[in-house]
A protein has these predicted regions:
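Conserved N-terminal phosphate-binding loop of PLP-dependent enzymes in the Aspartate aminotransferase
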Residues: 1-232
C-alpha cells in the first residue's frame, strides 16, 4: 500500500519499522508487519525490509533510524513506521503518548510516514472515533495514514485506510491499488448503516462513559488483585 513511497539510498532498499508485540493481520502484507513468530513462520518468506523495534523504547527507535547511511554497513532509509496505540496482542498495552510523540518527531525529521493501525481501537471503541484523537493516547499526534476495519460494518467484512494530505494521496494513482471485493454494494451498505446507528445513538460518547464506569467500578472493589485498568 506504499507505492512510490519507498526511496533508496545508494541502492539500498527502504525499510518499514514495526513494533514488537504488534499485530496487523494475517494477509501477506499485514502479516509481514506482525511480530509474533508463531504466526509468521508458516508463511515465510514474507515481505522483506520490515524491521521490528522494541515497543515503547525510544533508544531502540532512534537507533533504527540512525542506521540509515551510505557506508558499507549503513541501511536504507526508513519509509514508514507502523504501530498500534494500544497493543491488544501484548495484553492491551498502550504505547504511551510521550512515545508516540517521539515517533512522530523522528518520522518528520527523516521524512518517513507514520501509520497508525486502528483496526482494534477505531470506530468509537476508545470514546473517540479514532484512538489517535485522544491526546492521552497519542499526545495530539496526527498520523499520515490510518487503517480501520471490523467495527466499521458491524461485523460484516469491511476495511479501509485514510491518508492525510495531498502528497500522500497522490501516491495512489488510478490502477495502483485494487481488490476484487473492494467497494462491494453489500459491504458499503453495511458500513453506512453501522455508522448511522453509531451517530444516531451517540455510541461513541456512550463508550467513553461506560469505559469510565467500568474502570471506576473495578478499582472501587478494593480487590488487591486489581492494581490497574489498562486501555480506554
Amino acid at each position: 500500500t506504499l507505492p512510490g513511497a519507498l526511496p533508496s539510498i545508494g541502492g539500498k532498499p527502504a525499510r518499514i519499522l514495526a513494533m514488537t508485540h504488534g499485530f496487523h493481520g494475517r494477509t501477506m502484507g499485514a502479516l509481514s508487519a506482525t511480530w509474533k513468530p508463531g504466526i509468521r513462520k508458516p508463511y515465510d518468506p514474507l515481505v522483506p525490509n520490515i524491521e521490528f523495534v522494541r515497543a515503547g523504547d525510544k533508544v531502540a527507535l532512534h537507533d533504527a533510524f540512525a542506521q540509515t547511511g551510505l557506508g558499507r554497513y549503513g541501511k536504507g532509509p526508513v519509509a514508514a513506521v507502523i504501530l498500534e496505540l494500544i497493543q491488544g496482542e501484548a495484553g492491551v498495552q498502550p504505547l504511551g503518548a510521550d512515545y508516540v510523540k517521539f515517533v512522530r518527531e523522528l518520522c518528520d525529521i527523516n521524512h518517513a510516514l507514520l501509520i497508525i493501525d486502528e483496526v482494534q481501537t477505531g470506530i468509537g471503541r476508545t470514546g473517540k472515533w479514532f484512538a489517535f484523537q485522544r491526546d492521552d493516547l497519542s499526545g495530539g499526534v496526527t498520523p499520515d495514514m490510518v487503517t480501520f476495519a471490523k467495527g466499521v460494518a458491524g461485523g460484516f467484512p469491511m476495511g479501509g485506510m485514510i491518508a492525510f494530505g495531498e502528497k500522500l494521496a497522490a501516491l495512489f494513482t488510478p490502477g495502483s491499488h485494487g481488490s476484487t471485493f473492494a467497494g462491494n454494494p453489500l459491504g458499503a451498505a453495511a458500513g453506512l448503516a453501522t455508522l448511522g446507528v453509531i451517530e444516531d445513538e451517540n455510541l461513541v460518547a456512550n463508550a467513553e462513559a461506560r469505559g469510565e464506569q467500568l474502570r471506576d467500578g473495578i478499582m472501587a472493589t478494593g480487590n488487591p488483585l486489581f492494581v490497574s485498568v489498562r486501555g480506554r
